A protein has these predicted regions:
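Specific pore-lining/lateral-gate transmembrane helices of multi-pass inner-membrane transport
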Residues: 78-96, 255-372
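Interhelical loop/hinge segments that connect adjacent transmembrane helices in multipass membrane
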Residues: 1-12, 16, 152, 179-180, ...
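Membrane-proximal transmembrane or re-entrant/amphipathic helices at the cytosolic face
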Residues: 2-10, 428-429, 443-492
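Hydrophobic transmembrane helix module of multi-pass membrane transport proteins
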Residues: 2-5, 60, 96-238
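Transmembrane helical elements of multi-pass membrane transporters/channels
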Residues: 18-35, 161, 182-197, 201, ...
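Membrane-interface helix-loop junctions in multi-pass transport and translocation proteins
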Residues: 40-50, 122, 148-152, 163-195, ...
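Alpha-helical transmembrane segments of multi-pass membrane transporters/permeases
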Residues: 17-30, 87, 126, 130, ...
Length: 492
């Protein structure tokens, strides 16, 4: 029996590692495709056009955040613990989201008209609202696949969507398409991704039945704590473009959006790892607390080891990044935003990992309070940051992202306090110290070379320097290397 248990544990470790690699590979390809759009879109639409796109997207997100009612995490966690419930939970989630999505989308369109936004912005809101309904349904399918740990199919849908999105967007840019056509690409590619994910559930269809109102109510109640956390978290993170437009101008929103896109592309790593490990963490929390703590530590260590050099690049050579992308001169205003964004990257990375660990350990009720405080503080802080940034620096976007970084630091501190006792230990601080020490030679080289007229090619020797220092200081575990080799050998 003990041998069977040991084999089962080894199988789970291999599955977890495989899921991490599959998701990470998917996110790497997605990053490259997203970067291609980031390369061309600001050049074509300019700061004002990019600001209008970002504003419409954030405006609709404020309404769309209420559609899932916090059920996405419920689907992942409950299905990971009992996969026989997948069909019933998925049907209930879809029945809940479709009417809510239509209602909230209609409210977003109506609100844009009542607020007398320009005809262009109203059209962009209509397109974004339609895409929001599709995305909400697709999210239910993706969450179910994540709970089943079927990340291969979920990754296939993501890749199809990203390939289509990047290809169509770039084609429309070179075709000189209007702004609303560019916004419509998200709706089209989201529909294709929905179809790909839905094809994974063909065998479940014969057994599906219409959920009862009691089942819908049970799912809503289970999602309520997550809904509070997600709603407050979204309001905190997505209101900046709206506030900036109120305080400054569409061009300033564009500077902020350009920097946010570059910072956002760096978040593929924690997104990949937390997506892959949430089901395993949810399962381990109820069955093996020691393994749960160990997995959280390794997850945080890997993410922060990769986040430190990315943060340094954004802080030290943002001008070279803007020059590489050949953005119009007006986007020079994004450089100070990127410098602050580099510091914020470390906080974003830590918050994503710690938040995932708290959710897996059933601590979502505690997260609601922290997210509520963050929202109540962040909105006036963003107003103040945007206003004073505009007055003193002629750049409200810098003040806005400074307020974001401050609130993110509060969330990281809050999540640390919510973790089960003994999850993180002094060894984690020592590891972060080693990673920081490994990054110092890279930072010195980067700072030295950035003073001369060098291109972004300097990132290649920087990566080599950091990698060598990580090996010397033992930031990379031999256990991790062995696991990767084992997974790759089995796949071969």
């Amino acid at each position: 029996m003990s041998e069977e248990l040991q084999r089962e544990k080894e199988s789970q470790k291999t599955r977890v590692g495989r899921n991490v690699l599959v998701t990470l590979a998917t996110q790497l390809v997605s990053w490259a495709l997203t970067f291609a759009v980031t390369l061309f879109l600001p050049r074509y639409v300019g700061d004002t056009g990019l600001g209008n796109l970002a504003f419409a997207d954030s405006f609709v997100v404020i309404f769309g955040v209420f559609v899932p009612l916090g059920t996405s995490t419920v689907l992942v966690r409950e299905i990971a613990r009992d996969q026989s419930r997948a069909g019933n939970l998925l049907a209930t989630a879809l029945l809940l989201r479709l009417p809510l999505g239509l209602v909230m989308g209609g409210l977003a369109v109506g609100a844009a008209a009542l607020l007398h936004y320009s005809a262009l912005v109203q059209l962009l809101v209509l397109v974004a609202a339609s895409g929001m309904v599709v995305a909400s349904l697709n999210d239910a399918l993706a969450s179910t696949l994540q709970g089943q740990e079927n990340l291969t199919r979920q990754s296939a849908a993501v890749l199809v969507e990203k390939f289509l999105f990047s290809g169509l967007t770039i084609f429309l840019i070179f075709s000189r398409a209007p702004l609303w056509a560019l916004a419509s690409v998200t709706l089209l590619t989201g529909t294709v991704s929905l179809a790909v994910n839905a094809s994974a559930f063909r065998r479940l269809l014969p057994g599906l039945r219409l959920p009862s109102l009691a089942e819908v109510r049970t799912l809503v109640i289970a999602g309520t704590p997550f809904m509070g956390w997600i709603v407050f978290r979204t309001l905190y993170s997505r209101t900046d473009p709206i506030i900036l437009r109120l305080v400054t101008s569409a061009a300033t929103v564009g500077w902020y959006a350009a920097a946010s896109r570059l910072v956002g592309t760096s978040l593929f790593l924690p997104a990949a790892i937390t997506t892959a490990l949430l089901p395993a963490l949810s399962r381990l929390h109820g069955t093996d607390s020691a393994a749960f703590r160990q997995l959280v530590r390794r997850m945080l260590g890997i993410v922060m080891m990769c986040g430190i050099p990315i943060a340094l690049v954004l802080m030290l050579v943002p001008g070279q990044l803007i020059a590489l992308l050949h953005y119009p001169p007006s986007f020079q205003h994004s450089i100070p935003v990127l410098r602050v964004g580099g510091l914020a990257v470390l906080l974003y990375y830590a918050a994503m990992v710690l938040g995932t660990a708290v959710v897996a350990s059933d601590g979502q009720n505690k997260m609601v309070r922290a997210s509520m405080i963050a929202t109540l503080v962040s909105i006036p802080a963003c107003f103040a940051g945007a206003y004073f940034g505009e007055v003193y620096w002629k750049n409200g976007a810098t003040g806005a992202i400074l307020s974001d970084a401050a609130v993110e630091a509060y969330l990281v501190f809050s999540y640390l306090r919510m973790l089960p006792a003994g999850t993180l230990i002094g060894e984690n601080l020592v590891f972060l110290g080693r990673c920081t020490a490994a990054a110092l030679p890279m930072a010195a080289f980067l700072e030295l070379m950035s003073r001369s007229r060098t291109g972004v090619w300097i990132l290649l020797p920087c990566a080599a320097i950091y990698g060598i220092m990580c090996l010397i200081l033992r930031c990379i575990s031999t256990q991790d290397i062995a696991m990767v080799r084992q997974i790759l050998a089995k796949r071969a």
